[in-house]
């Protein structure tokens, strides 16, 4: 979903994209409030309803004040952020063209900081990710006669342990990185050695070099260990979300705009990149972009639960703050020399 708002002043050729993700999660909403999900097994457990509300609020105010700016605001509502990353498809289908988008602005609700504050960072904000699947193929046999088998469970266990050396022994310790194995499936009974085991995991890195190295080494380690233990191995590694990297100049502009709304003391510095991924990174890979975190925690109201939890909630008082900062940034960008 996309919409354009054009200013009534002389067109300066500037176009700013403002993005909100709109999808929900496959969770049962256990909140006790008027806006809890009415659809069984589906809820807004990551604040995307807040993002959408903020963008709609920005749209209303910007549209009602077109006389104060020239240029164009492109409203971009992104589906499938939690799954395949809708931003990638939107870009492929031309969301950043006709008219060409010069910069993109976005935010995310942040339940670890209080309403009335924001958190922003120059440079890398979120990690890149590469999900992987490893299928180890051996030869099954009776559990009493392991010499008659090529045991894929033993092979898989060695692969899993060896993968941890990528981060601990091959990545610069100054660069955060993670290789996580989250699933392993194989076997049907305690006395049967299976033919096959499937391993599922994900790589998370902060630099292009670490990403390329980790992807290469997962494949080399898995195939090498399997071969040395007489097994076969198939490795599939997906090219998923890139690192989200903020534009330094836009971060400075955002800080100044946010300080006008909430005060300098409430504009917090994000000290370290987040290991989670964010599909806004696709936009930031194409054009200069800025992405920040909007505080939505309120201890007095009991709004303290983490994202992707069935009790996740946002303090609604954070919404007008997000709208005000967004409008301040947009108008400043479109009216500055």
Model-flagged regions — what are they?
Residues 154-337:
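Metal-dependent amide/peptide-bond hydrolase catalytic core
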Residues 16, 103-105, 290-292:
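Hydrophobic/aromatic beta-strand patches that form the interior of the parallel beta-sheet core
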Residues 1-44, 53-56, 60-69:
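Acidic/His- and Gly-rich active-site-bordering loop/insert found
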């Amino acid at each position: 979903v996309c919409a354009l708002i054009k200013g009534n002043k002389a067109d300066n050729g500037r176009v700013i994209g403002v993005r909100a993700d709109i999808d929900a999660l496959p969770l049962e909403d256990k909140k006790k409030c008027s806006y809890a999900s009415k659809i069984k097994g589906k809820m807004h457990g990551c604040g995307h309803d807040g993002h959408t509300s903020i963008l709609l609020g920005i749209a209303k105010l910007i549209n009602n004040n077109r006389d104060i700016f020239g240029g164009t605001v492109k409203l971009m509502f992104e589906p499938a952020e939690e799954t395949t990353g809708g931003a990638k498809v939107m870009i492929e289908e031309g969301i950043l063209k006709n008219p060409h988008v010069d910069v993109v602005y976005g935010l995310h609700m942040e339940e670890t900081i209080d309403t009335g504050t924001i958190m922003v960072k120059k440079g890398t904000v979120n990690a890149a990710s590469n999900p992987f699947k490893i299928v180890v193929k051996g030869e099954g046999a009776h559990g009493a006669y392991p010499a008659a088998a090529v045991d894929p469970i033993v092979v898989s266990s060695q692969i899993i342990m060896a993968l941890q050396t990528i981060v601990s022994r091959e990545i610069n310790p100054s660069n955060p990185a993670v290789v996580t194995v989250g699933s392993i499936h194989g076997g049907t009974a305690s006395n049967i050695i299976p033919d096959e085991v499937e391993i599922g995991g994900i790589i998370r890195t902060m630099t292009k070099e670490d990403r390329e190295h980790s992807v290469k080494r997962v494949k080399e380690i898995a195939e090498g260990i399997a071969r040395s233990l007489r097994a076969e191995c198939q490795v599939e590694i997906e090219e998923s979300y890139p690192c989200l990297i903020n534009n330094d100049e836009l971060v400075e502009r955002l800080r100044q705009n946010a300080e006008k709304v909430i005060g300098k003391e409430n504009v917090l510095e994000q000290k370290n990149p987040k290991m989670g991924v964010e599909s806004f990174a696709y936009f930031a890979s194409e054009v200069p972009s800025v992405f920040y975190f909007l505080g939505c925690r309120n201890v007095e109201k009991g709004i303290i639960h983490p994202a992707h939890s069935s009790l996740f909630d946002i303090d609604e008082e954070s919404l007008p703050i997000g709208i005000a900062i967004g409008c301040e940034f947009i108008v400043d960008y479109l009216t500055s020399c």
